[in-house]
Amino acid sequence: MGIFKSIVALFTSVVMFFGTVWNAGISAVNSYSFTVDTSELGDVLVNPASNVNIWSIQGNPFVGVKINEENNIFEFVDYIQLMQCTGGNADRDLFKDPYDRTVLDDYDFTKLIENCRGIIGLGAKPMLKLGSVPLKYSAKASEDEYFGTNVYPPDDYDVYYNYIAAIAQALVDEFGKEEVLSWRFGVMTEFENSQWFMAVSGDPDESAVEYCKLYDYTVQALIDVIGEDVFVGAHAMVVTEGLWDERAFINHCASGTNYKTGEKGSRICYLAASFYDYSPGEETSGMNFEKTMKHLKNAAEKAGLKGLIFGVDEGRLLCGNTRGSSDNQLLTRTVGYTYQAAYDARIYRTMFNNNINYFSSWSFLSGGLINGNPTVSYHVASNAAKFDGAKLAETKKTYRALFPNIEVDAVSAYNEETQTVHVMAYNYKNDVDYKNTAKINFTLKVPQFDCEKVRVTAYVIDDDCNYFDEWQEDRVTYGIGDDCFDWSPDDPEIGSTTTLSAQWAREIYFNELEAKYKECSKLEPVVSEAEVKNGKVKLDIKLDPKAVVFYEITQVK
């Protein structure tokens, strides 16, 4: 026994020694080098943060709403996605009496029209998710399903077609055909998710047929009223298995027989997926983000569909690491910690490198979609949006530290019109408590520049522009425990009662803290100049853990 104890003690000492050396080593030599070459250009990039989504228009969230001038998300958000806005329960069904099955055409589109008008007034365009079938159109309909909406197809597809056509006509009458043609339309949310839609039988194959039929009737109603150029598509789960394989629908659009017209195929302009990791530190049980999107794109390419755009209609993180009084879900599907900045940056890098059009967000501000202080997600999104119109530039990692589970990476682009080089880099580990700085060196080869100096504008997104670390300290000071929250306290939308629910704590937040956090969340650029030597520009930075840096580099003449 004595020998055994001695061996254990020796082993423990060795482990502790090397653990100390390992951690010290990371801090000392966590170094990376990148080469950017703007003579090697690829695809034209688009703004990856152009979409936001909202769960419901109940309560008219866009009627009479004014732009937040200080933190205006509509400087980069182009579309507001209204999820399942034309059916599924009494709040979403657009009728005078959603429960009266004796009258099937007592339409009342006032709520939809007024909210669309409000969205346009904010400088954005509506993206309307259609497809959920009104209660009175399905004999088996129930509001007791998982999402509180009817999951079954219509009993009579012609009645449903007339409803969608009437909605389209009302929108054209109110806003004009040219305006509505600039909007986007979708048919269902996660169409192969049985919690959103399925056949009455629940059979996978029958459910696929019913959805394809629903899609065809919906799209044709839009075409017949708005025109053949209407922008319409569909949103699948993809990241995890649904009731049936989404490729059945993709193949139907490419070469199947249209259930409404009898012709070959169906109009489709975009395909979207959902992508959720479970929580910080726990990735999805399904495909990672890049594999999810490649799966969707490959399926469309194999089916022969061309010219589509690909996006993500909802996602990021389902749950936080701490639980509120009733749930650990994240209201905005993001956390307030600076970890989220690097998480978002690596998503945008994947999008730029794989020609993914957009990743829709639930919120960018502490008070909801329109109001409040900027989160780190806002700062990353607003800077990533500046890549819009630039061409992807060759970015090579020429040196990297050999430490596991740490991801330090970069992406760059060159805008030929503005003659600007854009670079984004991040220091990420899938751990909210990650604590190691990364030393990053860049060598930029920009033959387009004919100058001796360049102006470098750097935006560093770290704890210094994040109110959430101060919020954690203030929670301790004021005794605001996890039981003061309904859902996860890790969510940055403190202004929502779904997040911070205790009234006494809300009074402290709004009366004493929110104004202070305005200063804590400001992102100030740092402007400097760098020399051009032998056609190259060299930059370096020590990037804090979980932080992100954006560079904008222009000529000084």
Predicted regions and their residues:
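Sec-dependent signal peptide recognition
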Residues: 2-13
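Conserved beta-strand positions
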Residues: 52-54, 82, 187, 234-235, ...
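Acidic-and-aromatic substrate-binding clefts and catalytic sites of carbohydrate-active enzymes
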Residues: 53-67, 104-109, 193-197, 237-251, ...
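Carbohydrate-binding surface patches
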Residues: 403-483, 487-492, 546-549
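C-terminal beta-strand-rich structural cap/linker in extracellular carbohydrate-active enzymes
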Residues: 481-557
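Catalytic-core region of carbohydrate-active enzymes that cleave or remodel glycosidic bonds
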Residues: 278-367, 372-388, 416, 431, ...
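Mature N-terminal, pre-catalytic/accessory segment of carbohydrate-active enzymes
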Residues: 16, 20-67, 545
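Substrate-binding cleft and catalytic face of glycoside hydrolase catalytic domains
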Residues: 75-282
